[in-house]
Amino acid sequence: MSLLDVEGLRVRLATPNGAVTVVDGVDYSVESGEVFGVAGESGSGKTMSMLALLGLLPEGAVVDGTARFADRDLLRIPRRQLRDILGREIGMVFQDPMTSLHPMLSIGRQLTEHVEHHLHLGRRDAEARAEEILHDVRIPNPAAALRAFPHQFSGGMRQRIAIAIALACRPRLLIADEPTTALDVTVQAGILRLLDRLRREHELAVVLITHDLGVMSSIADRVSIFYAGRVVESGLRENVLQRPRHPYTRALLDALPHPEAAHERELVAIGGSPPAPSAIPAGCAFHPRCRYTQDSCRTEVPLLVAVDDRTLACPVDPLA
């Protein structure tokens, strides 16, 4: 059995103009020790699908489906039990560590309070664990770092500290939401190497949410591509990214710069914009932007079905 099994996940959010569906029937699973990549443009539903599991959606949100984590349905258990799981068994790393870290509290206080609450350790043991995890994520001079404040660190170091807090209680699953977006390329590579090392050393499952297929290609074992609240293609990284079979996946890859081929190919922008959740077009949601649109694409919603080495929601193969 997978560590996390999500089936039929639907999320509706309340807006001034009525409820809108932002996640529409999503299925996926995550295995222990793997990195599961979730990619798509802004507004594709990738982050909302994870926040739904953790009870972190805005007030008034309606969530349907099942999300079984270690034999418990995260969508059905009491909120108090869910809060205990979040932090102890599931860690979360957000995009901007400057907003996820409290600017007025020392790093030591933020780490030790987290450990004391979830692991019920005394102050001395909590401080020892805090220093240990800072060392584990390669923070120089961990003892001094515990006395410092977030603004005293670079963006890359702050993100390492955020990862340390998320992993301080030795969770089984880490959800990392765009953890490298605000970082330069060199620091980004260091964070990805850190996540890869930690998951191998601790048999940690990682859900990596990103809009950058380049990031995902460097670390993910399996990937799911989201568009307009649905999964359109999913499978092993090498299959999906080396031979994409959904036009949207193909378009994302065509728009990705390849330094080694900078003088041999032009970047191809994806025409148009992702639809707003309140204005999803009929048929395939991607058809207004697709180079391979057929008449049926305008009226029929493609089902996500198993096709050879992946699951796919499109009858057209852009590489055929």
Name these PLM-found stretches.
Residues 111, 163, 187, 191:
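Hydrophobic anchor residue at the start of the ABC signature
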Residues 74-91, 109, 117, 239-244, ...:
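ABC ATPase NBD coupling module
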Residues 62-73:
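Conserved ABC transporter NBD signature motif
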Residues 55, 175, 179, 183-265:
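P-loop NTP-binding/switch modules centered on Walker-like glycine-rich loops
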Residues 236-320:
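Charged, flexible cofactor/metal-binding loops and thiol motifs
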Residues 168-172:
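A short, proline-enriched helix->beta-strand linker immediately N-terminal to the Walker B motif
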Residues 39-40:
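The feature captures the beta-strand-to-loop junction immediately N-terminal to the Walker
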